[in-house]
Amino acid sequence: MTFREVMEDYFKSWGLSVRESTSISHKKSFLYQCKELLDLNIKDIKKETIENHLAEMLSRLAQSTVGHWNARCKSILEYAYNNGYIESDFYKNIVHIKIKNAYAISVITENQFQQLIKIAKVQTRHTDLEEKILFLELLFKTGLRHSEAKALQVYKINFDSNEIRVNQSLYCDIKGKWELAPTKTPCSNRTIKIDKNIAQKLKDFIELKHKNRDDFLFSYEDGSPRTTVFAKDLLKKSANLLGVKISAHGLRHSHATMLIRNLVPIQLVQKRLGHADPALTIATYTHLISDDEKIIVDLLEKIW
């Protein structure tokens, strides 16, 4: 059995847990960097085989690119081992290539967000300005992923209990073709509370637009949901004028940061964000948790 055949089996298996477009793009990216390995018998591939290939890749590619490829290769070899295609788990000892964080996602404070919205409100050249501002406010005040916010339909908002049901994500390609898909993980299916202020804004918006219960909350005149670029330019322009860097995903991080800064228990933050495990929340916001340790130290010093 060749490495290519094992790889094909792996991606078929892995593809069951992710969107088809994700599986295709990851497979294409991996294939592009391993043509020399594809026709080798899987049993002839050793630790040295992979590490020599990694060394060659490092001579011409960015470390992060090689790191991602290496991680995928190890997953494929682990799949081969678990399915009896190879007899050794040598992949565990393959050199680790650190994946550098190419960029840190910026966050903004509540005060900065309020200033950003004030700036956004005077950007009158933008079409559907009020809808875009509401979209940004929803992201900041709920921590929703932008794909989850775009998938919201009117009936998923309960104004009696001020809750939003999150059970789908909306993905769109560069040509504008969109699809509704399950949320990122099963744990991302959740119901979250919203404050009275944002609830009233949502209610007023729905009444103003005469939306039916099955309509997408954020949509074009023909009823189709807003695409990937929706509100992106407005956010970028307003952030630049304010002198900060922030993305739609950064608004989600800003929401989580606000909760942690106000000492909301990490388990509640995890559930609100739809993380599968508290460990993921801790890993993502470990710098904030470390800073909060200073609060404990300050308290102890005052006591003693």
Stretch-by-stretch model annotation:
Residues 82, 86, 93-152, 160:
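Basic, Lys/Arg- and aromatic-enriched nucleic-acid-binding interface segment
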Residues 151-204:
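Conserved tyrosine-mediated DNA breakage-rejoining catalytic core shared by Y-recombinases
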Residues 43, 86-88, 99-119, 174-195, ...:
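DNA breakage-rejoining catalytic core of tyrosine-based enzymes
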Residues 54, 71, 139-140, 260-261:
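Short amphipathic helical patch at the helix-1/turn junction of helix-turn-helix
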Residues 40, 63, 120-129, 142, ...:
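Short, basic (Lys/Arg/His-rich) helix/loop patches that form interaction surfaces
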Residues 3-79, 83-85, 102, 124-128, ...:
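N-terminal core-binding DNA-recognition domain of tyrosine site-specific recombinases/integrases
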Residues 175-181, 283-304:
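DNA/chromatin major-groove-contacting recognition/catalytic segments
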Residues 151-157, 270-276, 286-287:
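A short, basic/aromatic helix-end/turn motif that makes direct DNA contacts
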